[in-house]
Amino acid sequence: MTHLLSFIAFCSISLFVGAQPLDNWEADKIKVTQASGVQTIMHAEALFEDRWDQLPQAQFWKKIMLLSPDSCLINVAANRQILDQMAIRDWNAQTEAQKDSTRQAYREANGLPSDTRIYVTTGKNDFYRFTEVYPSLDKGVAAFERYGVDPWYAQSILLIESPALMRKSSTGAYGAFQLMPGVARSMGLVVNSTTDERKDFERSAYGAAQLIRRVCIPEAKRILEKHQLSYNETDLWFRLFVLHVYHAGALNVAAVVDKIQPTEGSQELIKAMWQNSAAGFGNNSQNYTQLALAAQLILHDMVYQNCTEISPCLSR
């Protein structure tokens, strides 16, 4: 995974932006009591306000994250509409010609144009281990708050990157927040042949928080202001936009926004980013915030199914 490779040199420039007050996110937090103890996490109310939870992309990835890798979903590439579910062994048993015929049969059965791209996506519950990741959310939320950074980002990144596995990606990203080595160094972490602070949760959280505070949020604002788009930093669409910068890099996000030429900042901008590519902003970049939405939905369900008590951190 590539986090702002094009900004490693840029990161050496001082980009300190005034941090928000540490109590600014109290209204977004909840205390969840379970048999294992009490955890403070971010609530998911914003997902339901503008019906983000009903978007087919969010529903698709939610199902994929919970689905075993021995199964797959047949889906429309453009909007992730689910057409069918089947065993992956049955799909793989077909010849390429048979697979093409099967795709065409799905198009005809669902009234889709003949050139509609049909994807076959396998389940990924072997990677997304939410029960194992859950204990780290409280630590991530607390760490980001200490550094004056919206803890929603900590929760989202931890859910997506699944730190329970602690794998190094093919591009070199590592640690709970999947930081690239050059980016980690530019944010103050030691990464060399003998020491890699990315494997330490607290140091990795520090590096990710600094990256978001010093680069991602300022660059997101710059891109939006270039297009004269207004924003509120606690709006869900803005947070998702910042996540795109975190994952794909500001230059790539700027390129896709230039292509879209949006007239307002809203859910529609995020949905347009899911449908467009430019520079290095491709399929993986499009998927990143879809995964974030799906992961938050799964967390919401998991918390409400397993908790004994939920209380707001700020009285309303």
Predicted regions and their residues:
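Cell-wall glycan-active module
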Residues: H3-L5, F10, L15-L159, R167, ...
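Peptidyl-prolyl cis-trans isomerase
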Residues: V253
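Substrate-binding/active-site groove segments that recognize
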Residues: G172-S193, S204-C216, Q267
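Cell-wall polysaccharide-cleaving catalytic domain and substrate-binding groove, primarily
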Residues: I160-A176, V183, G249
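Active-site metal-coordination segments of metallo-dependent hydrolases
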Residues: R129-F130, T194-A205, A279
